[in-house]
């Protein structure tokens, strides 16, 4: 009953809220919203051509990094990929167990990714938002819905939980490092996903909300 009340029912509520938000965003802005104009303009400022015609989402220009921002966002986007995130979570489960010898703490990284992923997959399937149109996109997109951003959600969820673990176990400089993990790294990943044409801005906002919520649930249940 505790799991049902503390995790399952709130998770269903989160899925419903995300789906409603996604439908509203699509209804109000369509599948080529005004927010994408900002992304196109920003990409153009760094020398990446964009095509205003619907469906022309992948530029024919070379995908090698040319600007500093390209060289920075490429590894960030790669770091937040699905296999990398799963491996990252598994590694931190092991590291936490070795350092803390606390089962609840050790499963926290896996638990937060499981919760975030379940909510992401369900809400994305319900929303079905297409990826941005007419943008520079150096890597092929995933087949899942653009809303919410799963990479962003996972980044905020996992790194938020890592920050909570540092604070719970009294690590040195936990406050400073915790802020970097909780806000800095995930925000940089969210930016990279938008800049590289993988998501609408609103996708990453929703992903950040999902990730923060997932971390809060795990903190309350496993890291009180």
Language model features with spans:
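Hydrophobic, membrane-inserted alpha-helices
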Residues: 68-74, 89-95, 160, 184-190
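Alpha-helical transmembrane spans of integral membrane proteins, capturing the lipid-embedded, hydrophobic core
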Residues: 11, 15, 89, 109, ...
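Alpha-helical transmembrane segments of integral membrane proteins
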Residues: 2-14, 104-112, 177-181, 202-203
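N-terminal transmembrane-helix/juxtamembrane module of multi-pass inner/ER membrane proteins
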Residues: 1-84, 88, 125-140
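Interfacial segments of alpha-helical transmembrane regions
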Residues: 94-118
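Membrane-embedded catalytic cores of phosphoryl/pyrophosphoryl-handling enzymes
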Residues: 135-224
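Short hydrophobic alpha-helical membrane-entry/anchor segments
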Residues: 19-32, 97-103, 121-130, 191-199, ...
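Small-polar-interrupted transmembrane alpha-helices in polytopic inner-membrane proteins
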Residues: 110-129, 177-191
């Amino acid at each position: 009953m505790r799991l049902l009340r503390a995790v399952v029912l709130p998770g269903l509520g989160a899925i419903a809220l995300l789906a409603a938000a996604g439908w509203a965003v699509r209804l109000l802005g369509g599948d080529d919203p005004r927010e994408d104009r900002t992304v196109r303009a920003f990409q153009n400022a760094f020398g990446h051509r964009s095509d205003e015609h619907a469906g022309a989402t992948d530029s024919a220009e070379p995908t090698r990094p040319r600007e500093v921002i390209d060289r920075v966002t490429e590894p960030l986007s790669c770091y937040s990929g699905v296999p990398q995130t799963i491996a990252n979570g598994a590694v931190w489960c092991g590291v936490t167990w070795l350092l803390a010898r606390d089962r609840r703490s050790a499963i926290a990284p896996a638990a937060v990714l499981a919760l975030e992923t379940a909510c992401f997959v369900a809400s994305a399937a319900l929303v079905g938002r297409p990826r941005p149109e007419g943008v520079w996109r150096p890597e092929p997109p995933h087949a899942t819905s653009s809303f919410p951003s799963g990479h962003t959600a996972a980044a905020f969820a996992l790194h938020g939980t890592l920050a909570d673990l540092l604070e719970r176990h009294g690590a040195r400089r936990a406050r400073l490092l915790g802020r970097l993990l909780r806000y800095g790294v995930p925000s940089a990943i969210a930016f990279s996903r938008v800049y590289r044409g993988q998501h609408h801005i609103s996708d990453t906002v929703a992903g950040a909300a999902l990730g923060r919520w997932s971390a809060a649930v795990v903190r309350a249940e496993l890291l009180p």
